[in-house]
């Protein structure tokens, strides 16, 4: 959990769509998915909470990159039978 938060804390050092931020984002994504697959569901809850907060502010409709990431997590949660998390993410964008 600390690694996830430490990496997120560095995001202000980079432009959001810079190659450097993409590399950090890819590390975060791989780390989080590995933690979820290992059974650390607090990471799934964090992802749903973080993405849900962003979606509630309209970013899902207005930011194609975020939409891609968001939809990717829905698909990934379904692939690994974490349907309750996919359902929760979908509920944020249906509101």
Residue positions per predicted region:
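Acidic, low-complexity, intrinsically disordered interaction modules
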Residues: 22-89
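Short terminal alpha-helical segments
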Residues: 1-32
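Short acidic DE-rich linear segments
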Residues: 91-95
């Amino acid at each position: 959990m600390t690694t996830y938060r430490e990496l997120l804390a560095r995001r202000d050092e980079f432009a959001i769509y810079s190659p450097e931020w993409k590399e950090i984002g890819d590390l975060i994504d791989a780390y989080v998915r590995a933690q979820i697959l290992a059974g650390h569901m607090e990471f799934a809850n964090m992802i749903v909470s973080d993405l849900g907060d962003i979606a509630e502010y309209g970013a899902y409709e207005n930011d194609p990159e975020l939409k891609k990431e968001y939809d990717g997590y829905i698909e990934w949660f379904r692939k690994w039978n974490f349907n309750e998390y996919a359902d929760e993410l979908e509920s944020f964008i249906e509101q």
